[in-house]
C-alpha cells in the first residue's frame, strides 16, 4: 500500500514539475514540485516560492490546482479511510467512520466552495481550492487579506473543523463535528 501511495505522490509531483518548469530552472522546478507535493499531502502548506505570494501566480493553472487538491484531500481524509476504500471498493461496504469522514469532507468542500464563491470575487476553481486548503493545508491562490469578513469567518470555521482523524491534517476533526 505504501508503494501505491508513494507512486501516486511521485506521479502528482511530476505533474507539478510541468507547472514550475516554466518559471524556474529544471533542477529548481524538480525541487519545488517534490517539496510542494510532500507539503500538500502532509497538509503543511509551506510557501517555498518566496516573496510571501504562495501559489497566487498559479491561481488559473488547472494542473497545479487539481494535483494540489488531490494530494491535500487524500492526506486529510485519514489513513484508515484510505485502507477501507481500497479494501471495500464500495461506499455501502465502508465502515461508519469512513462514511462519515468522506461525507463530511464532501459537505465541507461543497459548502465552503459555495460560501466563498458567494462572498468573494474569485473563480469556482479558486473557491474550491481555498475551501479545500483552508481546512488544514494553508496554501493560497488568492490574497486572503483582501477577503470579506464573511469569507474570512467561513474560512475560520473550516480551519476549526479541519481534517479527518488519522490524517495528516489538524482541527477538531470532521467526525467530531458530525457527532456534535
Place the predicted regions along the sequence by residue.
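Membrane-proximal intracellular helices of multi-pass ion channels
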Residues: 1-180
Amino acid at each position: 500500500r505504501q508503494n501505491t501511495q508513494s507512486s501516486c505522490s511521485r506521479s502528482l509531483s511530476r505533474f507539478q514539475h510541468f507547472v514550475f518548469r516554466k518559471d524556474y530552472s529544471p533542477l529548481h522546478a524538480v525541487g519545488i514540485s517534490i517539496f510542494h507535493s510532500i507539503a500538500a499531502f502532509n497538509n503543511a502548506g509551506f510557501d517555498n516560492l518566496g516573496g510571501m505570494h504562495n501559489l497566487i501566480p498559479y491561481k488559473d493553472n488547472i494542473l497545479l490546482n487539481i494535483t494540489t487538491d488531490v494530494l491535500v484531500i487524500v492526506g486529510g481524509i485519514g489513513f484508515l479511510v484510505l485502507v477501507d476504500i481500497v479494501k471495500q471498493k464500495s461506499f455501502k461496504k465502508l465502515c461508519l467512520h469512513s462514511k462519515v469522514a468522506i461525507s463530511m469532507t464532501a459537505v465541507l468542500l461543497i459548502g465552503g466552495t459555495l460560501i466563498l464563491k458567494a462572498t468573494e470575487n474569485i473563480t469556482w476553481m479558486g473557491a474550491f481550492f481555498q475551501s479545500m486548503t483552508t481546512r488544514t493545508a494553508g496554501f493560497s491562490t488568492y490574497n486572503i487579506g483582501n477577503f470579506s469578513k464573511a469569507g474570512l469567518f467561513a474560512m475560520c470555521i473550516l480551519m476549526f473543523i479541519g481534517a479527518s482523524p488519522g490524517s495528516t491534517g489538524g482541527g477538531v476533526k470532521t467526525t467530531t463535528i458530525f457527532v456534535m
